[in-house]
Design a protein with these regions (language model features):
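Conserved S-adenosyl-L-methionine
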Residues: 73-77
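Generic C-terminal helix-cap and adjacent flexible tail
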Residues: 8-10, 134-139
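Short loop segments at secondary-structure junctions
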Residues: 23-25, 32, 95-100, 114-116, ...
Length: 139
């Protein structure tokens, strides 16, 4: 399923994000830089030319968290217009293949459950995923 909120003529950026699940909680990170500093997101980043979404996600999690993930099924693709660009965000369910996570690029992190997802300020594109994630975590 795709969510669209699109305006033509903007720079287009394609990224991947890991919704890392551990039991009834997911891993969330707080941005430590840029226009969206202090907002929360799912870890991940830009895809490189010729790279699959899954390979990009494995690489990005290594770079951002010094961790290994097992990439599961696609949760959802979100299309979102930010003020300066159009974002295509491919979000995958993931699990950790390593125990330790090290924040190399983020300010903070937490493991919210379904009831806690609304307790932080999410980036707009990431926020679109919360209802689906909450329903899944409650099962």
């Amino acid at each position: 399923m795709r969510i669209f909120a699109h305006m033509e003529g903007r720079k287009r950026i394609e990224v991947v994000a890991a919704v890392i699940r551990r039991g009834d909680k997911i891993f969330a990170t707080q941005r430590g830089y840029g226009d969206w500093k202090d907002w929360w997101e799912f870890p991940g980043g830009k895809m490189e030319p010729g790279e699959t979404a899954q390979a990009a996600l494995v690489r990005e999690i290594r770079e951002e968290l010094e961790a290994e993930v097992c990439v599961g099924p696609l949760l959802q693709t979100v299309e979102w217009d930010y003020p300066a660009f159009h974002l295509t965000l491919h979000c995958f369910w993931c699990s950790l293949a390593t125990d330790a996570l090290h924040l190399l690029e983020h300010e903070s992190a937490r493991w919210p459950g379904a009831a806690d997802l609304g307790s932080v300020r999410w980036l707009p594109a990431d926020e679109q995923l919360l209802p689906l994630i909450a329903r899944t975590l409650k099962r």
